[in-house]
Amino acid sequence: MSLHFIPLHRRLNFGFVISITLLCILATMTLHAQVPIARLPKPPTPPEQAQWKEHGRTLPTPEARQPVLDAALPAYEPRRDIELSGHFKGAASDVLAILTHQWIAAFQKYYPKVTLDVQPPYAGSLGALELIKGDLQFVMVSRELKPTDVSGFAAKFGYAPFSAPISGGTFRHFGFLDAMGFVVHPDNPLKQLTFDQVDAIYSSTHHRGGKAITTWGQLGLTGEWADKPIHVWGVKPWNGFEEFIRQRALSVGDKRGEWRTDINFTETVFPISPAVAADRYALGYAGLAYIGDNVKLLDIAADASGPAVPLNYDEVIHARYPLCRLVFFNTNKKPGQPLDPVLAEFLKFILSREGQQVILDEAIFIPLRSEQANASRALLAP
């Protein structure tokens, strides 16, 4: 095969340049549309877990394409009316160790007399219980709080812990709060699910008002699929994956959803994608990093009147996909009273353009959209 090079002095055809550019763009779009992975991750080894506990998790390779910071995020305005100072102790989960220290370093440039001290151990199991002991003032957590976290905290203080989203999760990084999806066998003609349907399939409580769904025909499938049972797969409670799905789809207001007892429960999320791939009538959920290319992802609609959104990079970075994950700042804030000025400013900084830029610079987690940051900032009101 011979190769022909275009001399540099020859003028390139404009249409040719445009065609090549479009091909590159389409290639990038295709990369992020075909999100399931061929090689599934393995559970961490004890030495890896020990390393993470002491130093935080090693950051994965960033996505080739990165989000653009929301232009509507407000710039941070340091306080000039008072001089902030003091020593505050916090904790962070292993996936947030590096990001937390980067936030602290950036914040202390504004307030050099403030010390925010976050030391090992770093652990994904951290929650509000660490605040109950009283020796920590804040905890950075990469999951929703456990019910026992909330009830234990409320039993001591008489109110729930303060929990504010401060960052998006990731797109498909293993162990780093990847977006979640529902999957079926490739032969299954189903294309989408609503939260109402998820509740009707998975829960025993049906807080969204629907009747139990047990067959594929009840989801609109016809022919040979109409009377076939749905083989339901999920992660055994308690687990961060099942808690996220439970809170998003099964729980309504202060009504906590409960799982059906006949679900095929697995101890971890790892076996679910392979189980669905091996069963024509199976339905399961998992984080994107745990979903193989031998299953089919379903589009998800938060409600029946809204659009069903595919799990792809664009929908995740713009927080339009309903099962995007979040990172939380947790502390003890008594209702009706302001948060300590230092912690309040730290949170305001994280939610500002400068604070979200720290996330973008790390290139692993996804910055919040302005409406998400505004909602978290509103939680600071007494």
Enumerate the language-model features and the residues they cover.
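Flexible loop/hinge segments at secondary-structure junctions
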Residues: 34-382
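Bacterial N-terminal signal peptides
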Residues: 15-28
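Sec/Tat signal peptide C-region and signal peptidase I cleavage site
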Residues: 29-33
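Exposed boundary/loop context
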Residues: 8, 26, 277-280
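N-terminal secretory signal peptides that target proteins for export/translocation
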Residues: 1-12
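Short linear sequence elements within intrinsically disordered, low-complexity coil regions
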Residues: 10, 19-21, 112, 370
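A general, composition-driven signal for non-globular sequence regions
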Residues: 4-5, 26-28, 97
